[in-house]
Regions:
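Tryptophan (W) side chains
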Residues: 19-22
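Single conserved hydrophobic/aromatic residue that forms the stacking wall/gate
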Residues: 1-15, 363-372
Length: 372
């Protein structure tokens, strides 16, 4: 070991729970710091973090454990990848960049959320990502949410969509935009976002909890994949039901009733037979996405305030994948399909690339027969 590394490791041995700043650039080309937490018995513990670890495209990720072991002096009991991204700025030095966390003890585990055991009837309209995540959190807290979805279960919905792509008729209530899983079900389950929110990590953890790949937690541009996403969505639905909730498909939210400004009922329409019922409700969450125009019209006509949201108008640009790979990677092989990001300002307005879909298809997506 580099003498500086050896000395600083000895400092930790002498005072295991000391707040220490490590600098390992001379030895490993990386920076390291510790974060301190508390064990359940009140002892202090150190969890170490290594940033800016560079590995070649052909390296095995198990090399990261060896790097942690060298810094710690022995194989760590706890190890986790925090972040993984590809640095292709220099064609002669393309490499993966990692951040890892490790230690001799596992970090403290957050206590489960308290079960409130509420008897309030909560309706969630829509089973896209917003609706499902909302219902899962409600179930976690002891509620028994009722999810209302006009479309079909994800497997039945996939069949309807494939029939439409093959020239069949459009089902206006179950298509690329309506149905279990939301519109993202057929766009490879990409989870990259330009919104910097503290809730992003919790969303990723929830997806992994229900079956998404573990690398969703640390990839720079994570995506679940449409096939895996279908199972994740089904697992969420089964969990909601196991907690006493309901998920009703083929059911349209057609209205609500209030008294003195307070909600007391929702009106639901069964699409198979057109039968409409009114059910008592204490709370209502609208998670319909952006395509349920009839729902938005009903809400505004009922006096619910609404305001237009800014949106971007986009065009599709197609490139040969080999051209993008050569531009980004040069002649380096064995890397994932390359993408890029471009931003400019035209007449004081931003123009930017947003969604990269290597080896993708363009399909007409329309919620009704009269509108694209």
């Amino acid at each position: 070991l580099h003498p500086r590394v050896r000395r600083q490791r000895q400092m930790c041995i002498r005072d295991r729970y000391r707040w220490t700043l490590w600098r390992l650039q001379p030895a490993l080309g990386i920076c390291k710091r510790t974060s301190r937490g508390a064990c359940t018995d009140g002892r202090q513990m150190n969890i170490y973090k290594l940033d800016n670890i560079k590995l070649s495209p052909t390296s095995d990720e198990r090399e990261l454990v060896k790097i942690a072991a060298r810094a710690l002096g022995h194989k760590p009991l706890y190890f986790r990848i925090l972040k993984k991204s590809l640095d292709a700025r220099k064609k002669q030095d393309i490499h993966w960049v990692f951040s890892i966390e490790y230690g001799d003890e596992f970090p403290p585990v957050c206590a489960p959320l308290e079960k409130l055991r509420s008897h309030r009837k909560v309706y969630v309209v829509g089973s896209g990502p917003a609706g499902l995540l909302c219902a899962v959190r409600l179930a976690d807290r002891g509620f028994t949410p009722i999810v209302v979805e006009r479309g079909e279960r994800v497997d039945d919905r996939a069949e309807s969509v494939q029939k439409f792509f093959g020239g069949g008729e459009l089902d206006e209530n179950s298509n690329v935009q309506f149905g279990e899983g939301g519109a993202g079900t057929f766009s490879d389950g990409k989870l990259n976002t330009q919104t910097h929110s503290g809730f992003n990590a919790e969303v990723y953890r929830t997806f992994v909890r229900f079956g998404a790949p573990e690398d969703t937690l640390y990839l720079n541009k994570p995506h679940i994949g449409s096939d895996v996403l279908k199972n994740v969505v089904k697992n969420m639905r089964e969990y909601i039901i196991s907690c006493g909730g309901q998920v009703r498909f083929g059911t349209l939210f057609s209205g609500f009733a209030s008294r003195g400004g307070k909600l007391f009922a929702v009106r639901l329409k069964t699409l198979d037979n057109g039968f409409e019922t009114e059910e008592a409700a204490d709370d209502l969450v609208i998670a319909t996405g952006h395509s349920a125009r009839d729902t938005f019209a009903m809400l505004t006509e009922s006096g619910i305030a609404a305001e237009a949201r800014e949106f971007a108008v986009g065009v599709r640009i197609e490139h040969a994948q080999d051209c993008i790979n050569r531009a980004q990677y040069g002649n380096v092989k064995g890397l994932p399909a390359a993408d890029y990001k471009a931003v400019s300002t035209v007449s004081d307005r931003r123009v930017f690339t947003f969604c990269m879909c290597p080896v993708s298809y363009t399909h007409l997506t329309l919620p009704t027969n009269s509108r694209v």
